[in-house]
Design a protein with these regions (language model features):
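A short, exposed loop/beta-hairpin motif centered on an aromatic-Gly-Thr core
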Residues: 3-8
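A short, charged, amphipathic alpha-helix used as a generic interaction element across diverse proteins
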Residues: 14-20
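Conserved positions within compact, well-structured domain cores
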Residues: 25-288
């Protein structure tokens, strides 16, 4: 795979270059000491790079979170159904991530009545106008549904990696509609790795190091969780929103959660701040 290198005299020159059409944002892998940018050629849809893991549904996954500048960058934090994201530095000042400042909660009383995607309107899946991936990236980008997350677990090799590059492969246990992924005894060390998170790669690879060398993998960084004006568990746990309400509870929505002890698709309070990852391609949602 071709790699490119561009040098800058200072950080201001780098920021100015980012504003030009020569800057390919989705392909930037990292910025070193404020004067170097390395990036890799990847397939692109509507200006954002994706990885094709050969999934049965044909779903293509974005290589980075919405708001991120690289695959290891945490990106922005979003409440479910909100399209405005916030940096970690803005949490606690511009955004609390609580019912009191959630876009779909009335605050006139203590119950914080849900105003959309509730038992009255019976909407269970985000409309594209409320989909953070679609609103911010356009094209055919949208947030993944629960079925697309479960497909990732069942159709790839995957596992948790520490910021020291220690990878532990996970194994899926459950049905087509539910289950969890837990650590196995299979481990590996990835050289020059410095960000904790979760890795997915094709079953055809013998080891995670082969997939990393081929740059043929999906990585989701452990960006933590926002709530009550704080960002917690950064570098330990990660969470990424799905596009549908949690079963039987309009106050919660599905999300992919992971850590060093396990991973799966669970429910979380809608007001919480999590990462958003875009996908291209459709898959029928699980109905129950």
């Amino acid at each position: 795979m071709v790699k490119y290198l561009k040098l800058f005299n200072n950080h201001e020159d780098y920021l100015n270059f980012k504003k030009t059409t020569d800057f390919i944002l989705p392909n930037v892998s990292h910025c070193v000491q404020e004067n170097e940018v390395h990036y890799d050629a990847r397939p692109i849809h509507n200006g954002h790079a994706y990885v094709d893991l050969g999934l049965p549904s044909g779903t293509k996954w974005a290589t980075m979170n919405v708001g991120a500048n690289s695959p290891t960058d945490y990106g922005l934090y979003f409440a479910w159904g909100e399209t405005q994201g916030y940096t970690a530095e803005q949490v606690g000042t511009d955004k609390q991530f609580s019912w009191s400042d959630y876009d779909y909660a009335l605050t006139e009383d203590s119950s914080y009545t849900i105003t959309k995607y509730n038992a009255t309107d019976n909407k269970k899946h985000l409309e594209l106008t409320d989909d953070a991936a679609h609103v911010n990236w356009g094209g055919d980008w949208h947030m993944p549904n629960r079925a697309q997350y479960l497909e990732l677990f069942k159709e790839t090799k995957n596992g948790y990696v520490t910021d020291a590059g220690i990878f532990t492969q996970y194994a899926w246990s459950g049905s087509d509609s539910d289950g969890s992924s837990t650590p196995t005894s299979t481990t590996a060390t990835i050289s020059d790795w410095n960000t904790a998170g979760f890795l997915f790669f094709k079953n055809s690879y013998t080891s995670v190091t082969d997939a990393i060398s081929a740059k043929d993998y999906l990585f989701i960084p452990a960006a933590g969780y926002c709530g009550g004006g704080e960002v917690g568990n950064v570098g330990i746990y990660g969470g990424v929103w799905a596009s549908a309400l949690f079963s039987g509870n309009v106050e919660s929505a599905w999300d992919f959660l992971f850590g060093s002890g396990g991973a799966g698709v669970y429910g979380n309070d809608r007001y919480g701040g999590l990462s958003v990852r875009g996908v291209v391609g459709q898959m029928d949602e699980i109905t129950e």
